Amino acid sequence: MTTIILEVDNHTVTTRFILLGFPTRPAFQLLFFSIFLATYLLTLLENLLIILAIHSDGQLHKPMYFFLSHLSFLEMWYVTVISPKMLVDFLSHDKSISFNGCMTQLYFFVTFVCTEYILLAIMAFDRYVAICNPLRYPVIMTNQLCGTLAGGCWFCGLMTAMIKMVFIAQLHYCGMPQINHYFCDISPLLNVSCEDASQAEMVDFFLALMVIAIPLCVVVASYAAILATILRIPSAQGRQKAFSTCASHLTVVILFYSMTLFTYARPKLMYAYNSNKVVSVLYTVIVPLLNPIIYCLRNHEVKAALRKTIHCRGSGPQGNGAFSS
């Protein structure tokens, strides 16, 4: 492997990073490769099936499932940004990544994480309108509003990532830095910079606070109102039916927010311990795998649509209804 070092303004600037990943014996590397490859392929398959089921079943042409299809699409790319490079590193002695490759991976990772935070908040708002204002739900959650909200999620994610990258990509990294992680993330990159990264840290902290705190407040406020509404329902069966419509989303929210908040609680110090890599695996690999399963287990409409989709794909083309509100 050839290392290219450039001298710019009295700084030694590297063009490559070393991802330390999960240093273990070769036999365990092969085992990890097999496990993570199976997890990656299964995640892609699950989310693709959900997208196909929502697209092909007219009964799922509702705002709730429109946002769910965006979540599935997002998570397919979310894992694709990280998993392929991680899988290659399990089998290769060369665990380096180019500067441009690292910045590209970081940009899309931040984009998808920020987009998911906002999307989960919008899905919580959708459940709030459906349960607390059921009569006005079709009037409020129109196709136009849903499209605008979904587009806004992606726009905010892209812009947040772009602003962060402007500051992080300008930092100098000396020699060939070793990143104590299995992918390029913000905190480990800030830790290996050979110049003062306080400005980039402050921008990252402020934007992270905005992207995490505001959606979290929306989620908490939405579910507080939902809970208050459910408790006022007189019958136990009615309460159970109302809660079942948002149980899947609430489970996904708790999983994603708890993992990411735990990981990024102390960004400057979090990579001092390898245990944080395990937590990162949970929200970058395991949570995207579990999300489709959670929605299938707790949502009878999704389960029925998936059965129909699998049956149709296996037995040949079937007629599908047109999209409706």
From Swiss-Prot:
Residues 52-59, 126-144, 223-242, 298-325 are cytoplasmic. GO terms for cellular component: plasma membrane. Its main location: membrane. The keyword Transmembrane helix applies. It holds the Pfam family 7tm_4. The keyword Chloroplast does not apply. Residues 1-30, 81-104, 166-202, 264-276 are extracellular. One of its GO terms (biological process) is detection of chemical stimulus involved in sensory perception of smell. Glycans are attached at residues 10, 191. GO terms for molecular function: G protein-coupled receptor activity; olfactory receptor activity. It comes from the Eukaryota. The chain crosses the membrane at residues 31-51, 60-80, 105-125, 145-165, 203-222, 243-263, 277-297. Coiled coil: none annotated. Disulfide bonds join 102-194. Keywords: Cell membrane, Disulfide bond, G-protein coupled receptor, Glycoprotein, Membrane, Olfaction, Receptor, Sensory transduction, Transducer, Transmembrane, Transmembrane helix. InterPro entries: GPCR_Rhodpsn, GPCR_Rhodpsn_7TM, Olfact_rcpt. It is a multi-pass membrane protein. It is found in: Cell membrane. Belongs to the G-protein coupled receptor 1 family. Odorant receptor. This is Olfactory receptor 6Y1.
